[in-house]
């Protein structure tokens, strides 16, 4: 069966993403334009636009399209802004961020995922303003600051270092808490003081090294 990906992309936006209160025109245009199927394993390509998390291996998964849409809308990356992505994954959200912002630095701890994402970005021509680094975000050291920080996997609690990478006025998206009910939040480095906005409930795999400590029952 031949899949009409253009139609599938339109259906994803109109039937999944927009009804979940994603109304930002730039975000909707990005999701309606970028080929999500090019970032999905061949075995899952028929499900590229389904309302599902898709496995990436290494205990990670690709966010549902609705979560990607809400993430991008909350962060509002602008054309003159720089983005730090923590967890490259498939490279699809990386491409979306790159389409909306000036530059994306994306950190991926798994070398296989980093290499595959780089290849997909190059093959689609969507990676010209993207740099992928095969590093652990929990130990990565940089003096650079970013307008947007996007954490694509969950954390039990938000590492202080992630917040330190924000410029004044910067925004950080992260999913925090304990499975199965986690909270997506937006940290804003406001000039009047940092603030946190609660966005929605979801459930994501944990960032490597950021899961809760095991609970021992005696």
PLM-predicted stretches and their roles:
Residues 1-84, 92-96, 100, 113-115, ...:
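Class I SAM-dependent transferase core
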């Amino acid at each position: 069966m031949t899949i009409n990906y253009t139609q599938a992309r339109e259906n994803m936006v109109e039937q999944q993403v927009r009804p979940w209160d994603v109304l930002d025109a730039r975000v909707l245009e990005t999701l309606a334009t970028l080929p999500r199927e090019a970032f999905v394993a061949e075995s899952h390509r028929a499900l590229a636009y389904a309302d599902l998390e898709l496995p990436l291996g290494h205990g990670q998964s690709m966010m549902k399209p609705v979560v990607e849409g809400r993430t991008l809308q909350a962060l509002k990356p602008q054309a003159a802004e720089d983005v730090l992505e923590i967890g490259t994954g498939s490279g699809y959200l990386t491409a979306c961020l790159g389409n909306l912002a000036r530059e994306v630095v994306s950190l991926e701890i798994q070398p296989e995922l980093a290499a595959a994402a780089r290849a997909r970005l190059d093959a689609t021509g969507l990676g010209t303003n993207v740099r992928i680094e095969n590093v652990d975000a929990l130990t990565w050291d940089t003096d650079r600051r970013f307008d947007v920080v996007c954490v694509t996997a969950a954390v039990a609690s938000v590492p202080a270092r992630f917040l330190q990478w924000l410029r004044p006025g910067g925004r950080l998206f992260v999913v925090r808490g304990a499975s199965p009910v986690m909270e997506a939040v937006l940290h804003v480095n406001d000039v009047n003081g940092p603030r946190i906005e609660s966005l929605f409930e979801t459930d994501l795999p944990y960032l490597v090294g950021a899961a809760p400590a095991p609970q021992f029952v005696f």
